[in-house]
Amino acid sequence: MIIRSPESEVKILVDRDPVKTSFEEWARPGHFSRTLAKGPETTTWIWNLHADAHDFDSHTSDLEEISRKVFSAHFGQLSIIFLWLSGMYFHGARFSNYEAWLSDPTHIRPSAQVVWPIVGQEILNGDVGGGFRGIQITSGFFQIWRASGITSELQLYCTAIGALVFAALMLFAGWFHYHKAAPKLAWFQDVESMLNHHLAGLLGLGSLSWAGHQVHVSLPINQFLDAGVDPKEIPLPHEFILNRDLLAQLYPSFAEGATPFFTLNWSKYADFLTFRGGLDPVTGGLWLTDIAHHHLAIAVLFLIAGHMYRTNWAIGHGLKDILEAHKGPFTGQGHKGLYEILTTSWHAQLSLNLAMLGSLTIVVAHHMYSMPPYPYLATDYGTQLSLFTHHMWIGGFLIVGAAAHAAIFMVRDYDPTTRYNDLLDRVLRHRDAIISHLNWACIFLGFHSFGLYIHNDTMSALGRPQDMFSDTAIQLQPVFAQWVQNTHALAPGATAPGATTSTSLTWGGGDLVAVGGKVALLPIPLGTADFLVHHIHAFTIHVTVLILLKGVLFARSSRLIPDKANLGFRFPCDGPGRGGTCQVSAWDHVFLGLFWMYNAISVVIFHFSWKMQSDVWGSISDQGVVTHITGGNFAQSSITINGWLRDFLWAQASQVIQSYGSSLSAYGLFFLGAHFVWAFSLMFLFSGRGYWQELIESIVWAHNKLKVAPAIQPRALSIVQGRAVGVTHYLLGGIATTWAFFLARIIAVG
């Protein structure tokens, strides 16, 4: 008799037509909530509508339904992203000087927006070179387009239309997977299949197809562009793909086809898959052949990683087993129970993802300038500054979001009855030790880092420069950072056999790379000034973490409010008769954390902006003499607080303040307006609810007198709503002020 292994049943993983498609709901604002659907009685209704519209947890407690709504919303998000991308490419095709820039990227500046002549706004169309007038853009799109091999505005048009089609497709998918074929809960919880598809599919095949595009399209086209061939003379992408001889003229190994691959003679391909390190001296970007090699390697890694987990066949890892095997000497049950948490709480899952993605985004910010990936990116100082600032802000917001969703998980999804002695339980049980130690670290860092500056300001004020902490008096050299720099500068020969230079010029040792008389990158010296500001970074980051982590660890209970979990994620105070219990909800910790995140990121981007202008960016003469934008003043000026105010904020604000009457005047208006938005936030943050309620009631009285009283009763914002409006305007105003300040400065001098 033949014993067969039982065939794995194909599971039905979707429900057909679960939710009727109907536009009637659209006409009923708040249809997802019994209270809101009744319509407004007071003005609080509109605030609650905004607060709860996307809080799917509050619509239903059915995890499957929540999962479907989130899944469907993701398609909507993708649709918006495609629409945005399409708009960017369309502007490149219709309103830009891309083809002119392509012919002379060192002298012509990128522009993709031309202002219409209404009320004199056309003053904003500055001369960007090549006879084109428009607004200079700093998004880096031109550099990406060149790196990917786009040579004409027609190609940008086609891509824009393609993105539009994809946007429509995503909208359709969002509708289809909620109304027509909605996945069952089991599908959302099948983590091994998800890892398989995300690792092997998205990251593996995604990287492989990008590597393929780079090898067959980007590399040959960029070879021609670098050699000065007119973009109109370069063969079109499909010609390189279809005609191997064309590629073989540029990369001889193509003549041999796949033979070297199958005979394991892979080094033959070293003409287009390189391992050089450093920057291409023609473009000031990473070697595109290095980048293609990198994506091929990443593809191989992720294709393997995607096949490590057990799906329909009885081979491979199970995530549950892996997690439960994790037991350290001090962690009790270890990761037991984490699998259940992460497959039933999307907040817990999202929290981890946001923390990872936020950290990764900040890593991207630091690599964009130290290893500029695209041609002519490094010499476009406005774009370099914008990319760094943008990725730092985004990273900061994502990390605060991680804490927010971790706290929501604790309040809504954490079940203390089933969690005993696992990792999370043990962390919660010694949370007092964690928070008090972290608090001590913050106090230590704050007093010492700030104290060094105060010392320097005092000595400077008293005319005693020899007693200051500086590179020319009492030195505090960042010896560990310098050691890391030197190790990397000397590393290439020892770590990577074929590499000719270190990963980044910033480590030191190498020469500078200049393109068209502008510095692309050079070794970045670190000294006492960097030592001081780095400890301010440590201080602000630790305080942000203290606030956010305290919010998470005390989200369910504290000595002050033992039953905090019953009050929910956001609440103003613990009811009447309990003084001193305001601002303790998990939401309030996120609110407070946002301000410290803003502090932390501001210091980072100020440090970056000034350091690069002082020690890196600048012009180079025919004799090889480098003249930096601010002439190397960072080391001596930034060691006092007065120096930061005088030589950075005030000195560099002159461009934005004096921008009226020039093409940069919009930044002058934004600078003013954003300050106003920021100041407006203080009205919400520094006032009490009762003050406004009293004011409203006297205004309503006046309306009643004139018989024009509204049917919907006006109400002051709740405490939480007021804080939400306050922090939003604080951040929006602060970020837009910084944006105007940075761009007016760097476009004028860079």
From Swiss-Prot:
<keyword id="KW-1133">Transmembrane helix</keyword>
<keyword id="KW-0560">Oxidoreductase</keyword>
<keyword id="KW-0460">Magnesium</keyword>
<feature type="binding site">
    <location>
        <position position="692"/>
    </location>
    <ligand>
        <name>phylloquinone</name>
    </ligand>
</feature>
<feature type="transmembrane region" description="Helical; Name=IV">
    <location>
        <begin position="291"/>
        <end position="309"/>
    </location>
</feature>
<dbReference type="InterPro" id="IPR036408">
    <property type="entry name" value="PSI_PsaA/B_sf"/>
</dbReference>
<feature type="binding site" description="axial binding residue">
    <location>
        <position position="683"/>
    </location>
    <ligand>
        <name>chlorophyll a</name>
    </ligand>
</feature>
<feature type="binding site">
    <location>
        <position position="582"/>
    </location>
    <ligand>
        <name>[4Fe-4S] cluster</name>
    </ligand>
</feature>
<feature type="transmembrane region" description="Helical; Name=VIII">
    <location>
        <begin position="531"/>
        <end position="549"/>
    </location>
</feature>
<feature type="binding site">
    <location>
        <position position="573"/>
    </location>
    <ligand>
        <name>[4Fe-4S] cluster</name>
    </ligand>
</feature>
<dbReference type="GO" id="GO:0009522">
    <property type="term" value="C:photosystem I"/>
</dbReference>
<feature type="transmembrane region" description="Helical; Name=I">
    <location>
        <begin position="70"/>
        <end position="93"/>
    </location>
</feature>
<feature type="transmembrane region" description="Helical; Name=III">
    <location>
        <begin position="195"/>
        <end position="219"/>
    </location>
</feature>
<dbReference type="GO" id="GO:0009055">
    <property type="term" value="F:electron transfer activity"/>
</dbReference>
<dbReference type="InterPro" id="IPR001280">
    <property type="entry name" value="PSI_PsaA/B"/>
</dbReference>
<dbReference type="GO" id="GO:0016168">
    <property type="term" value="F:chlorophyll binding"/>
</dbReference>
<keyword id="KW-0602">Photosynthesis</keyword>
<feature type="binding site">
    <location>
        <position position="691"/>
    </location>
    <ligand>
        <name>chlorophyll a</name>
    </ligand>
</feature>
<keyword id="KW-0249">Electron transport</keyword>
<feature type="transmembrane region" description="Helical; Name=II">
    <location>
        <begin position="156"/>
        <end position="179"/>
    </location>
</feature>
<comment type="subunit">
    <text>The PsaA/B heterodimer binds the P700 chlorophyll special pair and subsequent electron acceptors. PSI consists of a core antenna complex that captures photons, and an electron transfer chain that converts photonic excitation into a charge separation. The eukaryotic PSI reaction center is composed of at least 11 subunits.</text>
</comment>
<keyword id="KW-0411">Iron-sulfur</keyword>
<keyword id="KW-0813">Transport</keyword>
<dbReference type="GO" id="GO:0016491">
    <property type="term" value="F:oxidoreductase activity"/>
</dbReference>
<dbReference type="InterPro" id="IPR020586">
    <property type="entry name" value="PSI_PsaA/B_CS"/>
</dbReference>
<feature type="transmembrane region" description="Helical; Name=IX">
    <location>
        <begin position="589"/>
        <end position="610"/>
    </location>
</feature>
<dbReference type="InterPro" id="IPR006243">
    <property type="entry name" value="PSI_PsaA"/>
</dbReference>
<comment type="function">
    <text>PsaA and PsaB bind P700, the primary electron donor of photosystem I (PSI), as well as the electron acceptors A0, A1 and FX. PSI is a plastocyanin-ferredoxin oxidoreductase, converting photonic excitation into a charge separation, which transfers an electron from the donor P700 chlorophyll pair to the spectroscopically characterized acceptors A0, A1, FX, FA and FB in turn. Oxidized P700 is reduced on the lumenal side of the thylakoid membrane by plastocyanin.</text>
</comment>
<protein>
    <recommendedName>
        <fullName>Photosystem I P700 chlorophyll a apoprotein A1</fullName>
        <ecNumber>1.97.1.12</ecNumber>
    </recommendedName>
</protein>
<keyword id="KW-0150">Chloroplast</keyword>
<feature type="transmembrane region" description="Helical; Name=VII">
    <location>
        <begin position="433"/>
        <end position="455"/>
    </location>
</feature>
<keyword id="KW-0793">Thylakoid</keyword>
<dbReference type="GO" id="GO:0051539">
    <property type="term" value="F:4 iron, 4 sulfur cluster binding"/>
</dbReference>
<keyword id="KW-0812">Transmembrane</keyword>
<keyword id="KW-0157">Chromophore</keyword>
<keyword id="KW-0603">Photosystem I</keyword>
<feature type="transmembrane region" description="Helical; Name=XI">
    <location>
        <begin position="724"/>
        <end position="744"/>
    </location>
</feature>
<feature type="transmembrane region" description="Helical; Name=VI">
    <location>
        <begin position="385"/>
        <end position="411"/>
    </location>
</feature>
<keyword id="KW-0934">Plastid</keyword>
<keyword id="KW-0148">Chlorophyll</keyword>
<dbReference type="GO" id="GO:0015979">
    <property type="term" value="P:photosynthesis"/>
</dbReference>
<feature type="transmembrane region" description="Helical; Name=X">
    <location>
        <begin position="664"/>
        <end position="686"/>
    </location>
</feature>
